Amino acid sequence: MRGLLVAIAAFVCFGTAPSHAQPASQFKVTILIPATPVTGVPDKVFVLLTTDCPPGVGTGRHTHPGDEYGTMMEGSVLTRQEGGEWKTVNAGQSYYVPANIIHETKNVGTVATKAVNAFVLEKDKPRFTPVQ
């Protein structure tokens, strides 16, 4: 799991593997807490990470095998969940994406964004799955 980038997603997303359809030099993921067992829930892991996203870069449509919780620390992004409207998430605001929901985020601003994302994921599944 540690080898896949996410995104925050969201941005999410949320290291050491391919990014969300963007060159790794553009979208940076820093793992703060790698996949760690959740006490009393043997099939789940917790992951904490930050994402840095320059202007004009997005995550593309994707899913996660678990819930995503995030807070935008710097900048703002547009985000939407499958079937929903685009929404703006600004610095200081938090967001939630349920497990397996197709979603995407893009930085349409003029400054880089930074987000902190926490995930409770299914153990042994990729953290980020692109969707066409």
Question: What is the predicted role of each segment?
Answer:
Residues T59-H64, Q81, T88, K106-V108:
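Short histidine-centered beta-strand/loop micro-motifs
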Residues R2-T50, R80, Y96, F128-Q132:
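A short, N-terminal "cap"/entry segment at the start of jelly-roll beta-barrel domains
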Residues N100-D124:
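Ligand-binding loop in jelly-roll beta-barrel domains
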Residues H64-G83, Q93:
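Glycine- and acidic-residue-biased ligand/ion/polar-headgroup-sensing regions
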Residues D52-P54, G83-N100:
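Short acidic-glycine-tyrosine-enriched beta hairpin
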Residues G58-G60, L78, Y95-K106:
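Histidine-centered metal-chelating micro-motifs
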Residues P42-V45, G56-T71:
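A short beta-loop-beta micro-motif enriched in histidine and acidic residues
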